[in-house]
Amino acid sequence: MNYSAMIQNRKSVHAFREKEVPSEAIGQLRSYYEKTCPRLVPEIATELIVLDKDAQPALESSAGYNQFLIGAPHYLLLMSAPHSYAGINAGYMMEDLVLKLTELDIDTCWMTFTDSDKIKKALSLTTPLEVAAIVAFGYGEKTAKKLRLNILSMSQIDVRAEQQYYAPKKGVHDLVHMGSWSNKSGLDEMMDFYDDMLWQSFYAASLPPSYLNRQPYGFLVQDHSIYLVQQEDAYTDNLDAALDLGIVMLHFSAVASQWAGQVRWELSPAAPDGLPEGLRSAAVYHM
């Protein structure tokens, strides 16, 4: 998969057509999940469940933002064994499946939820695994044209029209800090040293969806280590925060691995020096 292209092409849609996804494409997704989909924490047991539109009435009472569920022809449920890293692992895996669906020209939308047991009861699921992530998928309704910046490198920007809603996000210079939190001095020089490759990884990490587009995280670069730092956010609960972290880690890892080899994250490392109160070191990657 060309992760850089899929990350730039993915979009969250909020209205789906009734057209169903062909069974062949769903079969490809299942095969990808079983054979290829990366696991952040491989020892956590997971299961992928594909639901059709008949599941919508059951989900409407148990999932969606403030119980508002986006109707779709299909839904993905990622089930997980209970684990302290179940949420972050689910975000990592499910976002990879979202990018696979993007490669198959299928649209998606992450769904929020708060109660796994309520969803399992509504769907009559008897598995001991818990609901860890939900994504609606299908073919999105066409929307008004919006300009999208397709940024190929720090100096090459392609402006194109795209059929999607526009949601502003923090850019690389907002997310990445050098040496100490809020310091930007030396950031551009570091990016230049890696000949745009590191910048592309951070750019990919600036694009993922997050709950209400809050992006309650950032990166702190110290020496040859990159820390993913979680910020307190009154609007984001623990489950959505964990999913958000997994998603952003997948985006960074998928692009960085194209030039740095396999990216291995250490979860919950000791806090780096100078991290302000209210911030938590969620993971670290040693280059």
Identify the meaning behind each predicted range.
Residues 1-287:
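Acidic, surface-exposed loops and disordered segments
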